[in-house]
From Swiss-Prot:
Belongs to the MnmG family. It comes from the Bacteria. This is tRNA uridine 5-carboxymethylaminomethyl modification enzyme MnmG. It is found in: Cytoplasm. InterPro entries: FAD/NAD-bd_sf, GIDA_C_N, MnmG, MnmG-rel, MnmG-rel_CS, MnmG_C, MnmG_C_subdom, MnmG_C_subdom_sf. Pfam families: GIDA (PF01134), GIDA_C_1st (PF21680), SAM_GIDA_C (PF13932). One of its GO terms (biological process) is tRNA wobble uridine modification. The gene is mnmG.
C-alpha cells in the first residue's frame, strides 16, 4: 500500500563508500538527509579487497579528508597495516595504503552515520524515483513508501541487476550474495538513461590456520606512524603482516586446460571487466611468457581467520579454484572458505552527467560511485562527497561546487567520466593527471581545506590549525631564503657524508637544499631554526623548495588551462547551427554538452580545428540555442 514516508532535503540511495560520504557531507552542511540502504548491517562493506589507498587512490582519500569527509578517519581507526608506497620515487607518486579490518571498518562507519545530526538511516529497497516534468522529487520503496526530497543521490554500487557467475553457474545477486536491485535499474531505463553492462571479480578467501606461511615472504607495515587523516593523532602500533607468494607453472597449466570453463572465455560474461585489475585467467592468457604472478595473502581482520588471496581473482568453477590453490606455495593445504566469483551489473553512461554529478536527463538527481562506471572504494567515496555537497547545495539554494583537474584527483576522475566517458570500469591512475606534481599526497590540505571550510565541512578549530601550518611553512621557507651557510669544517663534513661536493663560498640554505643529495634534516643541522619545526611543515618546506622550478612550470600550465575554463559554453547552445564543425565533433559535443572550451577540448573526437570554429562562433556573440521542449 502506498503511503507518505516523510520529506527531506536530500535522499541518498545506498550506503556503500559513495553513499556514506554523500550522506555525511549533506547532513554536515545542514541538509535534512535520509539514507535508504538494502541492509543496515552492510554499511561501507568491502566486497572485494579489504584495503584503502594505493597509487592515486590514497591521494583521493587525503583529498576527501581535506574537504571534511570521513573515509580517512575511518580507516585510521580500523587498519591492521599501513604502508607508504613508492618512497624511493618522487613526491608526486607517493601514496599511502592500509589493510582494513573490514568488519571493524563497517561497524565504525555505521556508528558515525547513526550519530550524525540531520541524518536518518532506513533499511529498504528503492524501486522507483518520483519524477515530475523532468525533475526528481523523491523515491518509492518496495513497501510503497513515498519519500520526498529536493535532491536525490543514487549510489547503488554493483547492485543494479547484479548477477554472480562462478563457472557455468549464474544467478541474480548483489555482491557477496546480497539481494540485487532489479526494478530500479529497469526504472532508470524507462526514464531514458543509457545503461551499460560492466563486470568485476573477486578472489577466493582461505582459512589462515591452514596456510604454511614458512613458504611465503613476510610483508610488514611501516614502523613510522602514518595516517590518512590530517586530524589523526593516535596511531595503531600492533600491525598485522601480509604475505607474498607466487603462482607456478602448474597453476598456469591448470588455467590453460580449463579456460573453456571460464565464463570470461565461454561467452557467459558479456560485461566489460576492469583493465587494471584482471582475473588470473586473463593474466595467464595475456602474459603467457611470465612464469609466475604475485599473490598477496591479506588478513581480512583481527577477529577472523579469513585471508584474501589478492591476485587470484577468478570466476572459474569452484573445484578448479581448489586445484589452483594447491599449486601455490604456502596454499597447498589451504581450506577454501569462500570461492572467487565474477559479478555483472548495470552502470549508467557517465557522459549523461554534468560535472556536478547531476544527471542531464533528470534535474535534482545525482549519481555517484560504481553506478557511474568506476571501480574502487576510493573513487566511489570521492564522487560521493562531491555529489553529497552538490545535492545539499541544490536543496539549500547554494552554489554548485566543481573541482577542476588542477584542484584534485577527484576533479580528474569526475572530468574524465563526464567528458570522455568510459567503456570499462574506470580506475584512477597517477598517469591520468596532467598536474600530478601539484596533486600530491602531502599537500591535499593546502589544496582543499580552504574550500572544505567555506562549504561548512571543516570546523573552526581545524581551520585555525591549518592556517597556523600554512604560516609556519611560509616562515621557514622565507628563513631558508635568507640564511647563509658558510663553508666551515662541520658544514663540509655534513655535505661530504651526504655524497655532495664541498662548498667554495657561502650559500643560501634554500639553494643548498635544492641539491638532490641534501634533505631538510641536513639543513636543520647546519642552520637550525629558533622554533620547533613540525615534521609536516618540514616536509612541505623541502618539497616546495626542492621542486620549485617544476612546480612553477605546472602552475603556469594551470593558468593557461584556467583561461580556457573561463571561456564558458551555454548549456543549451545549438551545435547544429555552427557551420564547419566535423560530423563526429558535432555528435560528441551534443552528447557531452561541455560547459567550457577547456572541457570541449578534452572530448575524444573533437580536434583543434573544431575548437577554433567553436571559439570564433562564441566570440561573434549571436548564439543559437536549442529549444527546451
Amino acid at each position: 500500500m502506498d503511503y507518505h514516508g516523510g520529506t527531506y532535503d536530500v535522499i541518498v540511495v545506498g550506503a556503500g563508500h559513495a553513499g556514506c560520504e554523500a550522506a555525511l557531507a549533506s547532513a554536515r552542511i545542514g541538509a535534512k538527509t535520509l539514507v535508504i540502504t538494502l541492509n543496515l548491517d552492510m554499511i561501507a562493506f568491502m566486497p572485494c579487497n579489504p584495503s584503502i589507498g594505493g597509487p592515486a587512490k590514497g591521494i583521493v582519500v587525503r583529498e576527501i579528508d581535506a574537504l571534511g569527509g570521513e573515509m580517512a578517519k575511518n580507516i585510521d581507526k580500523t587498519y591492521i597495516q599501513m604502508r607508504m608506497l613508492n618512497t624511493g620515487k618522487g613526491p608526486a607518486v607517493r601514496a599511502l595504503r592500509a589493510q582494513a579490518d573490514k568488519v571493524l571498518y563497517q561497524r565504525e562507519m555505521k556508528k558515525t552515520l547513526e550519530n550524525q545530526e540531520n541524518l536518518t538511516l532506513l533499511q529498504g529497497k528503492v524501486e522507483r524515483l518520483i519524477v515530475e516534468d523532468g525533475v526528481c522529487k523523491g523515491v518509492i520503496t518496495h513497501t510503497g513508501a513515498h519519500y520526498y526530497a529536493k535532491a536525490v543521490v543514487i549510489t547503488t554500487g554493483t547492485f543494479l541487476r547484479g548477477e554472480i557467475i562462478i563457472g557455468d553457474i549464474k544467478y541474480s545477486s548483489g555482491p557477496n550474495n546480497q539481494q540485487p536491485s532489479i526494478k530500479l535499474s529497469e526504472h532508470l531505463e524507462e526514464l531514458g538513461f543509457e545503461l551499460v553492462r560492466f563486470k568485476t571479480g573477486t578472489p577466493p578467501r582461505v582459512n589462515s590456520r591452514t596456510i604454511d606461511y614458512s613458504k611465503t615472504e613476510i610483508q610488514p607495515g611501516d614502523k613510522e606512524p602514518r595516517a590518512f587523516s590530517y586530524e589523526t593523532t593516535k596511531y595503531i602500533t600492533d600491525q598485522l603482516p601480509c604475505w607474498l607468494t607466487y603462482t607456478t607453472e602448474e597453476t598456469h597449466r591448470i588455467i590453460d586446460e580449463n579456460l573453456h570453463l571460464s565464463p570470461m572465455y565461454s561467452g557467459m560474461i558479456k560485461g566489460t571487466g576492469p583493465r587494471y585489475c584482471p582475473s588470473i585467467e586473463d593474466k595467464v592468457v595475456r602474459f603467457h611468457d611470465k612464469p609466475r604472478h604475485q599473490i598477496f595473502l591479506e588478513p581480512e581482520g583481527r577477529e577472523t581467520e579469513e585471508v584474501y588471496v589478492q591476485g587470484l581473482s577468478t570466476s572459474l568453477p569452484e573445484h578448479i579454484q581448489r586445484k589452483l590453490l594447491e599449486t601455490i606455495p604456502g596454499l597447498e593445504k589451504a581450506q577454501l572458505m569462500r570461492a572467487g566469483y565474477a559479478i555483472e551489473y548495470d552502470a549508467i553512461v557517465p557522459t549523461q552527467l554534468w560535472p556536478t554529478l547531476e544527471t542531464k536527463l533528470v534535474k535534482n538527481l545525482y549519481t555517484a560511485g560504481q553506478i557511474n562506471g568506476t571501480s574502487g572504494y576510493e573513487e566511489a567515496a570521492g564522487q560521493g562527497i562531491m555529489a553529497g555537497i552538490n545535492a545539499a547545495h541544490r536543496a539549500l539554494g547554494r552554489e554548485e561546487i566543481i573541482l577542476s583537474r588542477s584542484d584534485a584527483y577527484i576533479g580528474v576522475l569526475i572530468d574524465d567520466l563526464v567528458t570522455k566517458g568510459t567503456n570499462e570500469p574506470y580506475r584512477l591512475l597517477t598517469s591520468r593527471a596532467e598536474y600530478r606534481l601539484l596533486l600530491r599526497h602531502d599537500n591535499a590540505d593546502l589544496r582543499l581545506t580552504e574550500l572544505g571550510y567555506r562549504i561548512g565541512l571543516i570546523s573552526e578549530e581545524r581551520y585555525q590549525k591549518f592556517l597556523a601550518k600554512k604560516e609556519a611553512i611560509e616562515r621557514e621557507k622565507k628563513r631558508l631564503q635568507t640564511v647563509i651557510i658558510k663553508p666551515t669544517p662541520k658544514v663540509q663534513e655534513v655535505i661530504r657524508e651526504a655524497g655532495g661536493s664541498e662548498l667554495k663560498d657561502g650559500i643560501r640554505a634554500a639553494d643548498l637544499l635544492r641539491r638532490p643529495e641534501m634533505t631538510y634534516e641536513h639543513i636543520r643541522k647546519l642552520a637550525p631554526a629558533d622554533e620547533e619545526i613540525a615534521p609536516e611543515v618540514a616536509e612541505q618546506v623541502e618539497i616546495q623548495i626542492k621542486y620549485e622550478g617544476y612546480i612553477q612550470k605546472s602552475l603556469q600550465e594551470v593558468e593557461r588551462l584556467k583561461k580556457m575554463e573561463n571561456k564558458k559554453i551555454p548549456e543549451d547552445i545549438d551545435y547544429d547551427a555552427i557551420q564547419g564543425l566535423a560530423t563526429e565533433a558535432r555528435q560528441k559535443l551534443k552528447q557531452v554538452r561541455p560547459l567550457s572550451i577547456a572541457q570541449a577540448s578534452r572530448i575524444s573526437g573533437v580536434n583543434p580545428a573544431d575548437i577554433s570554429i567553436l571559439l570564433v562562433y562564441l566570440e561573434q556573440g549571436r548564439i543559437a540555442r536549442v529549444s527546451n521542449e
